[in-house]
């Protein structure tokens, strides 16, 4: 559209993709990106991959649309070439916590009138369109994973996803100190329990929120080289204890 506003059909697809995690809607979006014809979702996946790689994201690709039996060759990346850890990634759709976190960071920066996307696509993208993208991402509201680590009235936009062995979530949260991004993928061989990933993500999210809230209030976070206290050490009072009244 001339004013950058998605038409009704595209808006519905975006809403279903983010709010409902609909693979069907995501495939139709890929079809639009690929040109709009039947089967163009394959070209859309390739175009998306080429665009992201052109922005420097070498660990992100999509060679096959969702829920399809037809398969293509996988892509070799720096991440999947590192055999230190085997997280059983999907052979046809991959990213990393860093890559997806950068994409969200770029969208936020674009919505504020600066950053990588506006520089890379001059005249093709506007801050308003990037804000609309954040609004669609913000439709993912379930109070799970990273969401549970921040106060309920916090402004945020996040997108989660999961398979049997891995759970992931990436979000931008507006703290008193400004927006910050948390991107976290957790893998466990065999089966990733929801209770485990939920607890870890809630703790990480709360720690990030507490850190930026402390900074906003003028507090000094501990130096990264400060040793943690010995949990076995005896507890000593740091302030006088008022005697109980007789």
Over which residues does each language-model region extend?
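Structured C-terminal helix/loop/strand segments within mature extracytoplasmic catalytic/sensor domains
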Residues: 34, 92-97, 101-246
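Short intrinsically disordered, low-complexity coil segments enriched in acidic
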Residues: 1-5, 211
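Active-site SXXK
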Residues: 1-2, 17, 100, 182
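Active-site-adjacent helix/loop patches that line small-molecule binding or acyl-intermediate pockets
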Residues: 5-88, 94-98, 106
């Amino acid at each position: 559209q001339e004013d950058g506003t998605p038409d009704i059909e595209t808006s519905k697809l975006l809403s279903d993709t983010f709010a409902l995690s609909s693979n069907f809607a995501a495939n139709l979006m890929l079809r639009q990106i690929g040109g709009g014809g039947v089967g163009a979702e394959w070209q859309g996946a390739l175009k998306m991959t080429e665009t992201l790689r052109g922005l420097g994201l070498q660990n992100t690709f999509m060679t096959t649309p969702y829920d399809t039996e037809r398969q293509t060759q996988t892509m070799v990346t720096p991440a999947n070439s590192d055999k230190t850890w085997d997280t059983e990634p999907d052979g046809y759709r991959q990213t990393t916590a860093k890559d997806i976190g950068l994409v969200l960071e770029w969208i936020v920066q674009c919505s504020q009138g600066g950053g990588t996307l506006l520089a890379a696509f001059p005249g093709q993208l506007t801050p308003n369109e990037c804000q609309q993208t954040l609004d669609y991402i913000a439709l993912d509201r379930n109070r799970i994973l990273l969401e549970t680590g921040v106060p309920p009235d916090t402004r945020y936009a996040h997108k989660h996803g999961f398979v049997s062995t891995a759970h992931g979530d990436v979000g931008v949260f507006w703290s008193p100190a400004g927006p910050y991004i948390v991107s976290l993928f957790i893998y466990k061989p065999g089966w990733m329990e929801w209770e485990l990933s939920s607890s870890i993500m809630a703790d990480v999210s709360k720690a990030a929120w507490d850190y930026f809230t402390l900074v906003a209030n003028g507090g000094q976070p501990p130096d990264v080289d400060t040793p943690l206290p010995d949990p076995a050490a005896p507890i000593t009072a740091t302030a006088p204890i008022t005697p109980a009244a007789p």
